[in-house]
Amino acid sequence: MSKPLPLVTRQGDRIVIVNGLRTPFAKQATAYHGVPAVDLGKIVVSELLARSGISSELIDQLVFGQVVQMPEAPNIAREIVLGTGMSVHTDAYSVSRACATSFQAVANVAESIIAGSVDIAIAGGADSSSVLPIGVSKALARTLVDANKARSLSQKLKLFSRLRLRDLLPVAPAVAEYSTGLRMGDTAEQMAKTYGISREDQDALALRSHQLAAEAWQQGWLHDEVMTAYIPPYREAIIEDNNIRKDSILAQYAKLRPAFDRQHGSVTAANSTPLTDGAAAVLMMSESKAKALGLPPLGYLRSFAFSAIDVWQDMLLGPSYATPLALDRAGITLADLTLIDMHEAFAAQTLANLKMFASDTFAREKLGRSQAIGEVDMSKFNVLGGSIAYGHPFAATGARMITQTLNELRRRGGGLGLTTACAAGGLGAAMILEVE
């Protein structure tokens, strides 16, 4: 076990999250079809500033992430600053940690506040799976570079004459891991088989996610943290996430065919999170700065931890490695938590992590700990549904989870919450949040 590591400034100030906001999330090629991630980021940051009631001149820094990169706007953070009327002197840089990207943005801001280099900052992320960087083949790319160096038309024509018809076809973004060639769904299948996660249990978790998310919207619990989005030509308002199945039944899930292992698999489109568009952001500052501005804290960041594991086997077990570290650094145990929110990339991955939380064998053999952190009380787990229902704009999910958990803790009268996620590349993230 590691020692507690308080997240406080030299003056003893805690890290405050004052406000959080997101756009409604939308399935690929639906509500935000044609809207790039940078525009989604501008929308949410502009509205967050308006709702927070502070001058944009006070923002020292914006740290923002994007996983599906736009070649024409590689630093999405700076483009958001320039496109929202914020001061041109506001520092801005971009981060990427796959599905844990906005967790990283929040951690970076927290570290800057602790170091004293930043007083007030915004952290978040945005992604679009509808506006994708479509590439060209390696053969065509090399020919284009060589042609740019050619001195005559005949030299250029000679270069292009070597190309085959297939070299001219567009190349879609890769969905597999660069280092292994494995898709995340392949790893989810492997974990389902390794840890005995049945198709029935996966479908049941997916149904639960949709039912709880539908209830959250019906009860009005998400209205304050999800803005209304207006997209050109501004004829319709987007007010809710459009992936949530409000009236699905378990029998419908059983009808879907496996998506990755077609013959023997159990991971389907229904028990996986879909490709999604959206953006989310949080406003952060030191505790004394919030008091000076008269801004009540939504909550506090108690601790965070990141993990990295093997990518060939169990790549999506990041939460099982990062969570014990975050708990130790906060000086608490799993039993102290009021809420637990885990990113549902796949139902199989989620259920496998829950098993590892409770496994003494895993704790001893993989973590070097004498015992497991504990079995999760499902009455505390993903109480408003998860990513299977809401969707997963890669860089925005962490900020969604943080805001959602803080608001739900406040609605319940306070307490401690865990937000945790797996990420491509064998990465994991975990954060402990507190509401008084």
Curated annotation (Swiss-Prot):
EC number(s) on file: 2.3.1.16
Active site: 99, 392, 422
Disulfide feature: none
One Pfam family this sequence matches: Thiolase_N
Pathway named in the protein's UniProt entry: Lipid metabolism; fatty acid beta-oxidation
GO molecular function: acetyl-CoA C-acyltransferase activity
Localization (cell): Cytoplasm
Keywords annotated in UniProt: Acyltransferase, Cytoplasm, Fatty acid metabolism, Lipid degradation, Lipid metabolism, Transferase
Enzyme class: transferase
GO cellular component: cytosol
A Gene Ontology biological process term: fatty acid beta-oxidation
InterPro entries, sorted: Ac-CoA_C-AcTrfase_FadI, Thiolase, Thiolase-like, Thiolase_acyl_enz_int_AS, Thiolase_AS, Thiolase_C, Thiolase_CS, Thiolase_N
Catalytic activity: an acyl-CoA + acetyl-CoA = a 3-oxoacyl-CoA + CoA
Keyword Manganese: no
Xref: SUPFAM superfamilies: Thiolase-like
Protein family (similarity comment): Belongs to the thiolase-like superfamily. Thiolase family.
Subunit structure: Heterotetramer of two alpha chains (FadJ) and two beta chains (FadI).
Function of the molecule: Catalyzes the final step of fatty acid oxidation in which acetyl-CoA is released and the CoA ester of a fatty acid two carbons shorter is formed.
Protein name according to UniProt: 3-ketoacyl-CoA thiolase
Species for this entry: Yersinia pestis bv. Antiqua (strain Angola)
Taxon lineage: Bacteria, Pseudomonadati, Pseudomonadota, Gammaproteobacteria, Enterobacterales
